[in-house]
């Protein structure tokens, strides 16, 4: 485990207006460290997706602070937030979001194009990223020629090809069978061994717990419990009434 790569401090989020207002997050604090895979677990409607959107600089908190590599996101404009995302954050989703007319390598290379990295170097980096997830022989295949598990591997390669500080994965195994789900979690756990990178996996599936260094439980917008792989537990790490 290494230093802090991302942290949320007393984050509140109010959604909606008037009588329909909902406090989706209630003073949540969460720290992601390099060399660590963290699970964020909770039932539907617990605030998992809202917190992930804020950590991913796609949604601003109503109150509180989010820092990415020590840089606070509050007050940043859309262009500044986009720059923080490009340089620091990789995303993996339940649905793979691959372009059907592009090969696996070209889908991965897109992540470098948005960082203004092109040419032969970008092609080589895309191939290397695919090799890391076990797809060295599938670089010229199109998404329709790949299984669901292989498509998710391409999505992971795309997320890490730019060497981000943080990988945020939203239910990455939900659309996969058990065997492919294990393979994907094994890859994410391996990626999380990098001391300069933290991985956060959002899930409701307890079968993913063995892959985690730390498990954070969220309920009704509050982080109610944290556990570590060795069984150490800390209760009620957030929870404003």
Language-model features: locations:
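ABC family nucleotide-binding domain
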Residues: 4-211, 215-218
């Amino acid at each position: 485990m290494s230093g802090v790569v991302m942290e949320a401090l007393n984050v509140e989020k109010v959604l909606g207006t008037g009588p329909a207002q909902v406090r989706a997050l209630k003073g949540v604090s969460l720290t992601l460290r390099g060399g660590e895979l963290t699970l964020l677990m909770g039932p539907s409607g617990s605030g998992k997706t809202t917190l992930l959107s804020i950590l991913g600089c796609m949604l601003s908190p109503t109150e509180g602070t989010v820092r990415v590599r020590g840089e606070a996101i509050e007050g940043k404009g859309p262009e500044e937030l986009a720059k923080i995302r490009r340089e620091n954050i990789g995303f993996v989703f339940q649905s793979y979001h691959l372009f059907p007319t592009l090969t696996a390598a070209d889908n991965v290379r897109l992540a470098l194009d948005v960082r203004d990295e092109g040419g032969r170097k970008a092609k080589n980096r895309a191939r290397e990223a695919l090799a890391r997830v076990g797809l060295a022989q599938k670089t010229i295949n199109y998404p329709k020629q790949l299984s669901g598990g292989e498509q998710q591997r391409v999505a992971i390669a795309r997320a890490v090809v730019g060497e981000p500080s943080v990988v945020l994965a939203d239910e990455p195994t939900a659309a996969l069978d058990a065997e492919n789900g294990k393979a994907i979690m094994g890859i994410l756990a391996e990626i999380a061994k990098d001391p300069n990178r933290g991985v956060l996996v959002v899930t409701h599936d307890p079968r993913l717990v063995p892959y985690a260094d730390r498990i954070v439980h969220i309920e009704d917008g509050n982080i109610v419990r944290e556990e570590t792989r060795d069984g150490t537990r800390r209760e009620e790490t957030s929870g404003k009434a």
